[in-house]
């Protein structure tokens, strides 16, 4: 059976999570009212998100993530083999973040996003310039796994 989602209606239910930072936990994100799991999709979920501030570095070991900007603006920072790439995104733009690539969002004035996110997701719970500089042991000590 097809799943039909009223995106505008679902996003309308959200409250802007203000002042998001890399250390914001999964429990804090869920309790904020700024995140909604709209549907299961393949090996992950379709999420609606509203926040201002800086998100944690994250990566998705099992697939690419689709991100669409609906309202506001954000800078998507992607850590590539050649270093940091930053992309200014505004409403109507879609980004495809490659599998297992560290990335984060910076939205000082606020953004509303729809994502198709594969699970699990690794969130790095410390503010660091380049997550690739951490050893495997350091990563284990600072990664919060999100499973849906």
Locate each region found by the language model.
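A short, N-terminal "cap"/entry segment at the start of jelly-roll beta-barrel domains
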Residues: 1-47, 56-57, 138-148
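Short histidine-centered beta-strand/loop micro-motifs
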Residues: 37-40, 56-61, 78-79, 86-88, ...
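Structural motif
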Residues: 45, 66, 73-75, 102, ...
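Short, conserved beta-strand element in jelly-roll/cupin
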Residues: 50-52, 61-80, 116
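Short beta-turn/strand-loop junction motif enriched in small, turn-promoting residues
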Residues: 53-56, 100-102
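Short acidic-glycine-tyrosine-enriched beta hairpin
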Residues: 80-99
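Ligand-binding loop in jelly-roll beta-barrel domains
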Residues: 90, 99-127
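A generic hydrophobic-segment detector
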Residues: 115-148
């Amino acid at each position: 059976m097809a799943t039909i989602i009223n995106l505008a209606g679902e996003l309308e239910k959200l409250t802007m999570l203000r002042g998001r930072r890399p250390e914001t936990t999964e429990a804090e994100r869920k309790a904020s009212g700024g995140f909604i799991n709209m549907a299961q999709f393949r090996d992950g979920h379709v999420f609606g998100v509203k926040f201002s501030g800086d998100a944690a570095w994250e990566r998705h070991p099992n697939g690419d993530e689709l991100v669409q900007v609906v309202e506001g603006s954000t800078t998507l920072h992607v850590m590539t083999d050649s270093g940091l790439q930053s992309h200014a995104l505004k409403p109507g733009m879609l980004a495809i973040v490659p599998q297992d690539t560290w990335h984060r969002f910076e939205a000082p004035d606020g953004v509303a996003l729809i994502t198709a996110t594969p699970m699990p997701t690794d969130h790095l719970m410390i503010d660091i310039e380049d997550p690739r500089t951490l050893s495997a042991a350091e990563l284990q000590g600072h990664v919060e796994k999100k499973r849906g």
